[in-house]
Amino acid sequence: MSIYKGIDFDDTLSAVVRHMDPVQDYRETLQSLQAVWDNLTLLGQLSGSGTDMSETRQAFAALTADLLNRLGIEIRNKAVQALKSKAQVAVDIMVRNLFERTADIGFLAQDDDIRGFARCMRDLLARGEDTQCCTGHRQRIEQRFREYVRKYSVYHDIILLGTDGRVLAQLDASNPVRQSADPLVREALETPEAYVEVFRRSDLLAEPRPGLIYAYRVTEEDGTPLAVLCLCFRFENETRRIFANLGKPRDRTVLALLDADGGVIASSDPYHLPVGAPMERVLEGDWGVVLFGGREYLATTRPTQGYQGYMGPGWMGHAMVPIEHAFAHQGADRLAALPAGVMAAVMKSPTLFSEELRNIPRQAEQIQRALNRSVWNGNVRQSSSEVPANTSFSKVLLWEIGNTGLKTTDVFERSIGNLNETVVSSILDDTRFLASLAIDIMDRNLYERANDCRWWALNASLARQLGRLAEAPDEARAAITRVLEAINALYTVYDNLVVFDAAGTVVAVSNPHYGECIGHAVGEEWVRRCLAPADTQSYVVSAFAPTPLYHGRHTYIYAAAIADTDAGHGGTCGGIGIVFDAEPQFRAMLQDALPRNARGEIMPGSFAVFADRGRRVIASTDARYPIGTELPLPEALFQLANGTDSATIHALDGCYHAVGARMSAGYREFKSADDAYHNDVAALVFVPLGAVPAAGEVPAGEPGLVRLPRLRQTGAPGGSTEIATFFIGDEWLGIVSAHVLEAVDATGITSVPGLPDHVQGVFMYQDRPLLVLDLKAHLRLRRPVDAAGYRQIVVVRGRGKEPFGILVHRLGEIPEVANSRIDPVNLLYQSEAALAEHVVRPDTANDGHGILIVLSPERIVARLLGGSTALAEPALALRALAGVVLE
């Protein structure tokens, strides 16, 4: 532990606690109250009132340290979680993107047109002939490169190199390179891997900055190298997109990608954190305080989790925020709009709140209960004091102690509320963030699908074989099938690839399990749209619906027309449809977005869903919400504008859940304003928070404090009487103070077989057993009460001075009531059965709390303990009420 301004803080907080404004505000308030407690403790010892506040003062001091520590830890955890999430997603989203690029280079290097051009150039160079004769061929290849980049817009250049590094063709005409000496060429020709991936400066790049290049050899069918193909990734463009999605306006967090040595290779704010700067990484633990540019930052560094075994180029995500701003804007105030019952239920959740956290309000309640009892007992003792001056001072002291206790409790309640809201708001932020992650993964994934179908539709062999169907149907189908199988082997996100002719009849499939579809018309509306394209950028997507091409299951089919290259008029000879393997792919996306604990385990009960604007489920990790069902959630969650998010608490299946939602916005050109395809999908992430209370169940809570005017006996005409009040349920009851010994904690009660139900048992009081009564069944209470909620025993003098105990939920005040406001019950109704002896009329000028019922110890004994009945006369003098002890 480390001491900071008089408070023992956890060592992990010592470097950051001074920057936590809520902790500092509560610390200052509680320490000022602690000084008051010190004075009151001293006055209590000097007053002779018998009220020693030392234990209460020490308990409040200990709880202050516990509470401030937990508040500090939760505020820190929330800030760290936000940084961790951003750093992790920054690197993981990039790695997912690059995983797709590793497939691109391998597939494009097998392109027949590129292979043919490379062969032609090799032969010309081998013969020493002028390559200018291949200008037309080169232009066609460069046009093919342009078509590729129009679809896969993540690339800024494509370069085809000879085995000697000579540039054979390239997309970017402004790039002056004609011959490369980059060792990348030799590595691509010799590597046993499926690709070469480099991030560094290269003579292949027009700019002097480092760039990301994917390369692989182009070979003959027998594996003889012909050339090297390079795809140049738009690294800066992509990192800007990633950082923009993770940032918010006026967010002071700086995001970066670091290389294996800790150098900054991309920054969300290059003026703040420049590219190339060395950065101190946080490699041990979730967070640390790092120094950069003479300033301290709260920071985290996260290695990638990889994707399908691919771990990327060895980069790490890094997030940091100036430490003086790291804990600002915690966002807990947004929970104020939630109904109190919702928050009360949520705060009980053992999944969200550890035993240590849930014990803090219990400790505060126990301390306040002990304080109330101490003040209550002090007032009871003062009622029998024979020294008026001392009594007057002691009463003022007790009143001040009670008031200070209330102020302290108020601060504790507010700080505990802040603590709880910090935990819940952190969960809400997490669900919102994870929903954004899920929909971003989906949009990026489906962007690739829209690209794939259009690019594969340009495969010249597919058009040629469709043209041969009439003359050699079996050979043509076999050739198309081989192409589809080769593609599907590389791209496992598809369950099936299908080629159909101009009439919409299936010609070939990649998955033999769908062989029965061959020769049959697809018969789905997307086929008609597919066969009427506007240009080579056109593609169509089916509705998310069951299809025979996916064995009757729901999926999306992406399709593009195959141009009839022999027609010469821009017509189509068929189309290609790629059947997305929706069930496992969407489930995996959602699984990756589920919240996890510190051990990496999915939080129990959490789940995630993709759904359309009509609330229909597209995918779910929870079997309770299968595909096609409608989610019973507010429409507002599905009315979000594209690219916006929300987080709230909502009841679902008898449980309150934190619900984070985000509406899709597409990725790059996909689903953009210029794209003909629009399909809004929401991602929703759910975390259970606590059970919804049963109908009519009222969350447990203490009755409100009742305050009556404190009158001097000499100041009220006819005198006054002190009444020791308490609550059974929410019923306000009392007994004349002179008949009360004290209140004690309701523990150590032993049940005794054979006694009536209203006798709860016995407990030891001053070394002798006393009976304890439960009066709830004899009071005609307005609503049922929880017997488990009894917290105090009021010890009352019975007949013959034999005491007994009454179970109560909470102690009230001991008001000094004017006798003119006290009426005997027997004046209202003649009965010997009532336990009540008097009623106190409310003082409408000072309070509106209703009637106080004063119970009679003698009647309780007579009715419930088998004693003889000796009812007081209706005209019983109030003097006797105040001063006569039952004999």
Predicted segments with their positions:
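Flexible loop/coil segments at beta-strand boundaries within sensory signal-transduction domains
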Residues: 219-224, 307-311, 563-570, 667-671, ...
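Solvent-exposed, extracytoplasmic
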Residues: 138-152, 183, 228-287, 323-350, ...
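Extracytoplasmic/periplasmic ligand-binding sensor regions of membrane-associated signaling proteins
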Residues: 142-233, 238, 286-300, 488-496, ...
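An acidic, low-aromatic, low-complexity terminal/linker signal
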Residues: 690-887
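Glycine-rich acetyl-CoA-binding "A-motif" of GNAT/NAT acetyltransferases
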Residues: 225-226, 264, 506, 572-573, ...
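Extracytoplasmic/periplasmic sensory segments of membrane signal-transduction proteins
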Residues: 29-193, 245-246, 376-536, 590-593
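Extracellular/periplasmic juxtamembrane segments that couple receptor/chemosensory ectodomains to their
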Residues: 2-74, 275-426, 630-706
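Amphipathic coiled-coil signal-relay and dimerization helices
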Residues: 108, 115-119, 166-172, 258-269, ...
